[in-house]
């Protein structure tokens, strides 16, 4: 969405972490596709088919291809111009759930009691864009492969705030100005952002207020 030069901050540890996360995604999603075969009452729903059947305002940029090991579906919303990768959609009875898979360290996994705050905005985004109320987070311990699941259903207030924030960011892009960093952002907030160097370059200049 944002058209600006970015810095490649890849490191061996980051690459290794990403590769481990990819393996976990593939492992979990390969099992998800076989749930009915394994006697599990949950149903795996093809994301692209769901988009087409429900006439959602989404462009399918890339469909999943299980034979090639590509389990995510790449989508773009035609109204908000937001691109995202959907891990999957599940159905239980008459209710649909967005599936979001997260790999996590053993230490973080042990402490996990609910959906972390840092993932809630993503849950709101996917809920709005796909028109599905509840996101089912599946956390996988990347060391021991233990799993925990948590449901998160965004409120109407969260969805309204998300839309306002997106309108603000879109306006910043159109005006080619740097948005304010959130007040509650900690030192890790920008750690893996590809646009960190761009923001640092203009940090002393006037930023665009909401």
Predicted regions and their residues:
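Short beta-strand-loop-alpha-helix junction that forms the active-site gateway
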Residues: 101-114
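A structural motif
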Residues: 93-101, 161-168
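Hydrophobic/aromatic-lined pockets within catalytic cores
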Residues: 32, 36, 103, 128-131, ...
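Metal-dependent nuclease catalytic cores that hydrolyze phosphodiester bonds in DNA/RNA
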Residues: 1-98, 105
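Phosphate-binding glycine-rich loops and adjacent basic patches that engage nucleotide phosphates
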Residues: 84-91, 121-134
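Short, glycine/acidic-rich beta->alpha junctions
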Residues: 80-81, 115-120
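Non-catalytic, well-ordered alpha-helical scaffold segments
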Residues: 21-25, 121-124, 187
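Metal-dependent nuclease catalytic regions and adjoining charged, substrate-binding loops involved
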Residues: 111-116, 125, 129-210
